[in-house]
Each structure stands twice: as structure tokens, then as C-alpha cells.
Amino acid sequence: MKATKETLSPTRVKLTVEVPFDELKPSVDATYRKLARQVRVSGFRPGKVPPRILDQRLGRGVILDEAIQEALPRLYSEAVQAEEVDVLSRPEVDITEFADGAQLVFTAEMDVRPEVTLPEFGELELVVEPATVTDEQVEEHLTNLRDRFAVLKPVERPVQEGDFVSLDLSASVDGEAIEDATATGMSYEVGSGNLIDGIDEAIAGASDGDERTFDTELLAGEYTGRTAQVTAVVRGVKEKELPELDDDFATTASEFDTLEELRADVRTRLESNRKVEQLGEARDKMLDKLIELVEVPVPDSVLAGELEAREHRLGHELEHIGTDRATYLETLGQSAEEFDAEVRSSAGKAIRSQFILDAVIDAESIGLDQGELMEQILMRAQRAGVQPDQYAQQLAQGEGLTALMADVLRTKALFLLLENAKVVDTEGNAVELNLPRRPSGEAEDDVRDISDELDAEELEVPAAAPSAEVTAAAGDEATATATATDADTATDADGAGDSELPASETK
């Protein structure tokens, strides 16, 4: 067999494959044997029908066509391997020449991974926001914590912002009552904005027993987009009374005995969260800089697949919250064209980032050991709320394990670049990024337990392939580090422990 590769573009090639009939003959013979078992001919036992009889019954041309179709996947695969083509799409195959007893010639066009030429990065410089925490931020956090321990006391006065009211609600559209839009005794914090548009303005200044009617646009349900007439009856007004900010409050709200100890702990936790946010900012800016420095074309099929996947995820999420695409775009204040252009740009950036990081993996010979992979499985299983061994088996059954391994490799490549970068804040101060480290102790024992669930063959590191989750693992690792740190602190201060790294634009 002879294969010739023609480069059509940086992301597309054409293979021309010539197969002598002698090399095709084993496939032809195998097809005759298969048909001899399938075709029933009087006077011949199954599997004993001679080729000449099959030719008479089915036609020599039909049999040769079937032999070629069954041989093409193998021949194509051999040609791809021989020419070392990194395929990213289904091939478009065309048989250009074939006659009985003569050679088979076919072509195959496919999208391929573009060649990425990495520049000498040197010491890349990134500028991020400072990780400082102000006194005002600490006090704001303490106020939020006090808010969680507030008590509600009935008052006999008109409704004010910040009050909690008990409401009876009903709604109608064009005089027709909406059955599933009624509520009795609903508690609502005035001014929070988490009920329906217009409710705050309608009940402002109302007293216990007052009835107010207003119009609002429905954003979900059967009457989405319609204007509804809503009636709200105030059934009680309560004001929120915050506890004094003193040592007694510190004892009640935390493990600390004094207010100063609590205040210091809140500052430490906020600083930890800011370091995680700082890492997320550095990560995103590194990806932006890589795309700026390295020109990478995006294969059409890969971009189309990514856009389709994103549209599918969006549709699933919108269905889950009970709304549609048009309403969602209206909420964003974007036209369909603007939204699609933004998604397309983001998807292209994600794919380019993947290709560049994959090139870094190759250039730096970045590898992956079993322990690193198992740590990721353990972490993701915990976040998914399933047993680690069950999560590992689910990955092994499909292509999830391959995708996870590629993500971890890309994460390592990104962190290597961050380690070698010069990072300063906007005030010119050097920044030491809070890069995650390997776990120890009990975590290592858990990792070893999970590894028993996967065969060694399943842990062979694949060539990094395009994935919609280009740098998700980078965010996951940083989040895991921050979460582990927060878990060691007993203060449950209104989200101080929730240090999720902002999702990368490439995720």
C-alpha cells in the first residue's frame, strides 16, 4: 500500500492511498466466506457455497464493493499511521479508482491538529490585582455574619426597605387567574429583589392588612413574556435586629472568645480567598497572552463541535430553570447575533488555548503519574458527591478517563508557565501565586485506594486531545486547595469558606 499526504491548509490534509489488488484479496476472500455462511443455496451446506455460485446469485461487483467497504477502515487507519496524521475529524472518503483485479485508489480528507510553533517565552510578565483586604471589607463581612444571627421583631409601622413581610400573593393575565401563581404567608425581605419585578415599589409604605396591585412581566411558565396583574396583601411586618458586635457575639458565632480573634480570622480567610481569585486572574491572563503570542488556526469541524456542545449545554440549563433562549438573551441584554458572536469567540479561544498547551506538554515533556491522576479523581468524586471508586469506574467505561488525563496534563503545562512567569500586582509588588500542591497523609491513602479500581493499562497517558474543558482542571485544583484550607477553619462566616476559582473563559 502506498499513501501520499497533501496539505490543503494548516488544519486540513488529503491522503491518497493506492492498494494493490493482492493486498485487497484477503478482504475479498473474507467477504466470500462470510457470504457463504449467510446465503442459503439449495444443495449446499451453510458456509460451503462456492464463490462462483455467489457471483451468480449476488454479482461479483456487489461482493467486491462489500469487501472494499469492510477493508476501508483498516486501510485508512494504516495510511494515517504511516503518514503520522493527527486526525481531529471524520474523514471524507472517495474511491477514485477500482476495477476487478486492479489496484484500489481512494482519497480521504480530514481536519488535523495544526502545527504549533512556540516562541521563546522567556519570563512572561503578568499584572494582577493586589490580594489585599481592607478594613472595610472585614467589617462588611462581619456585618453579613451579624445578619445571619439577627432576630425578627414585629413592628406596627409602614413597610421599609430591609423589613421582612408576610405576603399573600395572587396573579392573573387578562382577568384569568394563574393557578400556580398564588401563595399564602410568603416571607419576603423588602429590597432583596429576589421575588418578582415591581413588588418592592408596590408594598413600600404599606401597613399590615394593606392590599396593593401592580403589573409585572412573567419570565417563566405558561405565560412567559405576558403582563400579569399581581395582588399582594401584607399580613405582617417585622424588622431585623442585629446583635451587638462584641466578644459575646464572637463566642456565639465562632470558636473564638474575643471579637479581635474573630476579626483576625475573617481577615485571614478573606486574604486566602483573594489569593485564589488572584490565581484565577493570572491563569486567564496567561491564556490571553499565549493566544496573543502564538498564532494557531482552528479546524472548522472542531469549532463546529465545540459550538454544538455549548449550545446543547445552554439548552439543558435553560430547560432546567424553566426558561427559553429568547428570554435568557433579553435578561443578558444581548441580541442573538451578539450572543452567538461572543460564544464563537470564546469557543475559538478555548480551542486555541488547548492546542498551545498541548504544544507546551510536548516541548517540556510533561508527564502524568498515577498519583496525580488519582488525586483528580478523588477531588472530583467528592465534588460530585459519589464514592471515588464508583467515579473512577464511570470514567473508565467511556472516554471520560482520557479527557480527564488530557485536562490534568494541560493544567500542569499552564502551572509550569505560571511558575516561570513574573507576576506583579497593579502596585508593582511581586506576587507569589498560590499554586496547588500535592496532598499528603490521609489524602494519599485515599489516592492509593482509588488506583486499585483501575487497571494499569487504563492509565496509559493519551495524546492530549481537544476538549471543551481546556483549563477546567486548573480551576479545580486551585479550588480544591482553597477549600481544604477553609475546612480547617471553624468560622462559618457567610461564604468566607466558599472560595471557588472564577470559571475560565475557556471552560
UniProtKB/Swiss-Prot annotation:
Its main location: cytoplasm. Keywords: Cell cycle, Cell division, Chaperone, Cytoplasm, Isomerase, Rotamase. This is Trigger factor. It is found in: Cytoplasm. One of its GO terms (biological process) is protein unfolding. Its EC number is 5.2.1.8. It is an enzyme of class 5 (isomerase). Gene3D superfamilies: 3.10.50.40, Trigger factor ribosome-binding domain, Trigger factor, C-terminal domain. One of its GO terms (molecular function) is protein folding chaperone. Involved in protein export. Acts as a chaperone by maintaining the newly synthesized protein in an open conformation. Functions as a peptidyl-prolyl cis-trans isomerase. It comes from the Bacteria. Residues 162-243 form the PPIase FKBP-type domain. Residues 442-460 have a biased composition (Acidic residues). Residues 461-488 have a biased composition (Low complexity). It catalyses: [protein]-peptidylproline (omega=180) = [protein]-peptidylproline (omega=0). The keyword Cytoplasm applies. It comes from Parafrankia sp. (strain EAN1pec). Residues 434-507 are annotated as: Disordered. Consists of 3 domains; the N-terminus binds the ribosome, the middle domain has PPIase activity, while the C-terminus has intrinsic chaperone activity on its own. InterPro entries: PPIase_dom_sf, PPIase_FKBP_dom, Trig_fac, Trigger_fac_C, Trigger_fac_C_sf, Trigger_fac_ribosome-bd_bac, Trigger_fac_ribosome-bd_sf, Trigger_fact/SurA_dom_sf. GO terms for cellular component: cytoplasm. Belongs to the FKBP-type PPIase family. Tig subfamily.
